Amino acid sequence: MQVTLKPVFLDRFRAALCRLGCADDRLLCAVSDGPDSLALLLLAQQILPGKLVAATVDHQLRSESADEAQLVAKICHDLGVPHIILTPEAEIAGNLQSSARAARYALLERAAEAQNCQHIGTAHHADDQLETLLMRLARGSGVDGLSGIRARNGRVVRPLLEFTKAELIEICSSVGIQSVNDP
């Protein structure tokens, strides 16, 4: 698949990676079939050729999740990006959202180690950042307790925090990728 993205998007992404201290390192990119992570994949594929591995976590909580993971595998294959599908060893129990998140990050950490990737890229973006701040404010955090999504947390980096959801959708659309799912 031939990918040509707007130079302004590539420049912004490259600058974000530089600010995060990971412009020259290997990146494990967490990718679902949503536009956010697919845009992350497309940008990283252009800026980090040969230094990128994509990983899709299939929690096996929905009947269509395996097909969605295979769709991502096909996109990665077409882009020439190595891709792995990760599945939890144990059933997700307790608070589903919290348990799934913990399992996902544990799987990504192990995969990054196995793939010799120094960083794990996730697709949190500016709209997520605003939503997080508003939710914390609504819960009564107050100005002193307000904090957004961190751009870096250990080996996890979030280079899209300055991109809007609309821009990420535009990136996908510009190369003919239509996301299937947007959780």
How does the language model describe each region?
Residues 1-183:
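Core alpha/beta nucleotide-donor-binding catalytic domains of modification enzymes
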